[in-house]
Amino acid sequence: MEQGNGERLAVIGAGLVGSLWALMLRKRGYEVDVYERRADPRTGPVLGGRSINLALSDRGWRGLEKAGVAEAVREIALPVLGRLMHGVDGATTFQRYGLPDAPGHFGDPQCIYSVSRARLNRILVEAAEREGARIHFGHACAAVEPDGPDGVRLRFERADGSAVDVGPLERVFGTDGAFSAVRDRMMRMDRFDFEQKYLGHGYRELAMQPDAAGGFRMREDALHIWPRGGYMLMALPNPDRTFTCTLFAPYDGPDGLDALADPAAAEAFFARAFPDVMQHFPDFQAEWMRHPTSSLVMVRCNPWHRSDRLCLMGDAAHAIVPFYGQGMNCGFEDCSVLSELLDREGSWSEAFAAYSAARKPAGDAILELALRNYIEMRDKTGDPRFLLQKRIEARLAARFSGEWLPLYSQVTFSHTPYHEALAAGRRQDAIMARVMDRPDIADVWDSNDVAEAAMALFRSPDFVG
């Protein structure tokens, strides 16, 4: 499709996905205005209720590479090589991400990267502005009128109470998050499906400061997890040698987030459930009270576009829970896929239709995968039988690397569509259920017999799980 042509496009939302997409559009020669309801993140505080740091992996890197900002982002990204599981007794178990000999990015081993949301957003906003995008902060989208004869018209409300009318525009992209104003307008159109649901669990963050010498208080190349059945604590390292710790727990019950609103109750709970953590918080109660409890919302909708005028991307199309570390990566993949479709298709309407068809099943799949991964991390990662299964799978991946690719690697270190990875993972689960049914599996798990039996099922076209 021919690029540019002087078309005026608007991006609603200057978060991570919106600023990346604005940058990509400018590189294609379009006139781009970005409207963001919040104040400029470079001058104002980060709003509460958003995770401080994020996990960046292959799907996200592809989008950053396409936009020409990967090198700048690598400077603020911290490699994370695997999970470090913490038992109640203080014992730890390290589980490596990826395949041992698989190459990663920038000469690093295969890993994920911890990045600051605020610093990444700043890089993307400034790159978009340098490329010529006009970014208007403090503009809350109040109305979207897509059906005018001359294009889309928008109305924005500013912090001072005044209103601004914009348009006509050729098309508008909704990258304005889980409570999208653009999607809200699409919901009033015919044959638009929408579902919103809150998880029964929420989260609360704490910042673990560096030690007295200015160093990390825990292993810095690992995602730390304290699995405790109905709840769990996670800690992700930051380049400034802090850790962002996040408690995921139900709202209800004696150890629920509602009960833990009392800082003394929260401190007693942490001392009981995560005793090895308490030494790293000299004033736990003060730190606990610095951060709000936040909810976890999930959004599904269909389609993700309307004719050639409106298109949803990122959380506006597919808000998911954070337990696979793929929310941002999925949003960046939206940008990559749509950019590739614009190269391939002959018109915006064809590109948008192909985008919805490709990304809707992927968005549904990564939501399911994230929910499954929460159960795995919370309930199973301390289970010896589950850990044995993972050791068998790792052995299969190492020995049959051209065939057996673990589900985590398919999701995190490949560009296999999420729904295809989910289907492959279900089949692998069925194979492993057969393998783990052997009464002597604990004694022969690393034998050739076990490996060959698993691969015989894997290679059989008749085995569908």
Predicted segments — roles?
Residues 17, 40, 179:
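Conserved Rossmann-like nucleotide-cofactor binding loop
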Residues 26-49:
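Glycine-rich FAD pyrophosphate-binding loop
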Residues 9, 32, 134, 166, ...:
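Hydrophobic "anchor" residues on beta-strands that sit immediately upstream
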Residues 126, 133, 139-143, 148-296, ...:
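Conserved FAD-binding catalytic core of PHBH/FMO-like flavoproteins
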Residues 44-127:
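Active-site-adjacent segment of FAD-dependent monooxygenases/related oxidoreductases
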